[in-house]
Structure formats: C-alpha cells, structure tokens
C-alpha cells in the first residue's frame, strides 16, 4: 500500500531444486534480431509466459516466419494466440506520471486496452505505476510547470484522456516520478530475453542503420537459457506482486499472484547472475523520489571496474552517475595500462529528435559532462569517447547531424570488462537507473560469451578498421573516429566519430536544484 515500508526482496536463499544445467547466452543486437527471437520464444511457451516492458505497443508488426505462417500480424494477435493455446499469460506494462509524461501515460493505456480487450479469460495484464509518490510539498515547488501541463491537457478531447488525467484536472493527483524501466520476458522458467529493447515500430532497426536518424535505434538484449531464466521469473513475480499490492490498474478480468514465486539467487562468479535496481515509497516528509532497496547495478559495475586490468568497453544511453565515474577514475589510477572506450549517442533523444532545450535537459547534460571530466582527468589519452554516425550525408531536414553525417541513436546498456565480465540489461549509467527505477540485467563471465559480444559490437561499429589494430584498444577507436572525421560522410569506414563534446558543453547548464537520481 502507498506509504508502507516495502520488504526487501530475498536474494540470498537458493532454490532447492536441481540447477546444474548449463546456461546458454545469445546476444541479440538491434530489433532485427531481438523481435523475431522474442516471437519464436513466445511460440515455444507451453505453460506460462511472463513479460515486463516499459513500452509494448500491441500494434507492433510481427517479423518471424513462424508467426507470419500462422496468419498472425501484430503482437496483439500473438498474445491472443498464445493465451488461447492454454499458456498462462501475465503482462506487466509500465505506466507513467499522468501529468509530466502525459503522452507516454496515454500510450501505455492505449496499448494495455488494445491487448486487454482481446485477451481471453485467464490472461492477466497490469499497467503499473511505480508505487513512489512525491511528498505534497513538491506540488507547490512545481506549481507553474504543473499548471502549464494541466492547461494543455484541457485542450485534449475528453475521450482521449485516461481516468487518472480526468482526476488530475479535478485536482486529485500525486506526482509519480519513478517508473518500471526493465525489459524482460520469460517462458516456462526455462528461457528468457532480457536487455534494453522495448517493443514498438519506433525501435525497429538493423545493424546497418540505413534509415533516417529518427528511425535508427541501436540496442542490445540477450536470449538466456538455463538457471538465470528461473531468477528472471522470480524477479518478475516480485514485481507483479508489488503491482497487485499497490492496486495497479488491471486491464483483464483478474490479477492473481504468481504461484511458487521463488527467489532470485546470488550465485558467485563465474555463474551468470540477474541483477536489479529496486526502490520503494519511503514516505519521507520531503521526499521527491524513491527509497533505494537494491542497487545491484551500481554495486556490480563498481566491482567489475575494481577488477579491470586492461580494457573497459561501455555502450550507454547516458553517463551521468558520479559514483561510477569516480570508480572508473580510481581504476585508472590503480592500473596505468587500463583503457576506456565509451560509446554514447551524440545527444539525448529528446534533444536530437524533439528539440528539447529546457533546464532539466541542460542539467542532465551537465551531469554527463562532469562524469566525462572525472574520467578524462584520470585516463588521459587512454580514454576515447565516440558516437555512431551513418557513413551517409545528412539530408536537409535531418536533426542535429554530426560532421555532415546522419546520427545513429544509441539506447544500449552494455558494459564489458577485459574478457571476464559483461553486463547487459535495462540500466543506464545514470542515477535514475542506479537508484530509482525498476531495472534488471544479466552479469555473465564466460570468456567465450564476453569476448563474442565484444567482438560482434566492434565489428559492427569499426567495419574495416577492426582489422587495423587491437579492437580492445582505445587508440584504435580514436584513430577510426578521427580518420572518419577528416573524410566526407560517404567516404567513411564504419560508424565512429568523436563524441561532440564541445556542442554538449555549450548546451549544458549545471543547476543542482533536484537530486541527481532524477536524471
């Protein structure tokens, strides 16, 4: 219930059943690989299918041959088909603050209604706000932006507004600043997909990224078979129960607890491990955000950085969490030979594609520049920061081109340390993912799996540059980016260009009014 102290999810008690089978991990790079893999996995379900996504548009087209051969066209069709086969379906979709993120909130409800109106009896779908509610004082702090958004909401047709938004217009509302950000699906406790990619048409892309900038979307997920799938199931069961306890909106006839929910194990390396960020409503008098319960993403990243000896490779949508920057800097000082390759989008999505210039975006970029400065002082020329740009000239109306090329948007969350540790999942390297939002990722240590993922990504980004030196060396990535910067877009090799630090510094403004966990 709101305001109640949430019990921390159990992590240390192992299951009593046999868990000795081998774990198999397959990287899925971009939606071209992930979407069909998810469809095929769903079609293999025999007993149960559990899904938890931030964005899941019921209208998204199906891509796998098996689904299309059955005459199915959209994800709504596939969910109905799966439930009618007798598979127990539970879908947990993220909801969003009805005032500050009204468009996302309405989209979430529209998709939930689309699924829910077609699903047969026995299927269950919850669209859940995170339980955290900001203290009432923040309604006064944000009075003017709230009033502006409520005024805009009055221009929207009544039938397009949700019940939450109708209540908001009558003055009955809470600020809901935290969300479920994870992206995962698990079938029969046997196999799962976990990563950074949600499901809608906007996110469809291929490793060629041969589309207009606003259609590009680089992301990474994993298909996992073996013991971690049971842990993903247990994590889903915990999140599902919390949504029920908070009386989240149900779009089907029933919502029931997951039977035999189990516990998320904490196996020692080299066994792969599911890690989470989990928070609750702390009910502090002046609280804006959530009380952190589990910060396993932060802990595992710091532990991996402490063991780094030669090379750290990171792909992230954001790099704003100062504790991680300081941990990287400490690793650089301990290991004079340690190198860092950091790959990020040129700017945040809202800046590139929506032209956002508000103080919150400028402050968020200032947090990122601060983290880059911390690392650059420690690593010096052992660090390179790069952004992917298509080897094609920008068109007249393309948003924020870089050195004449069309940008590729990066949404991946990948950290690879030497040949012994990789982390792939939903958590960005920002305070929100480390402390507030509900997140889930997989840490794995098998050398073949770790190096296989790193080499696949390097070959995609570097292209022919991959063969010109050590792909684990920051120097090779820097040289590839600088050589491309000196060429015309159509003459470039691969995607790498130097991160546009100068224009991001001009854009950023440090305004430390709100907690860094909000960004």
Regions of interest found by a model, annotated:
Residues 1-519:
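Charged, low-complexity intrinsically disordered terminal segments
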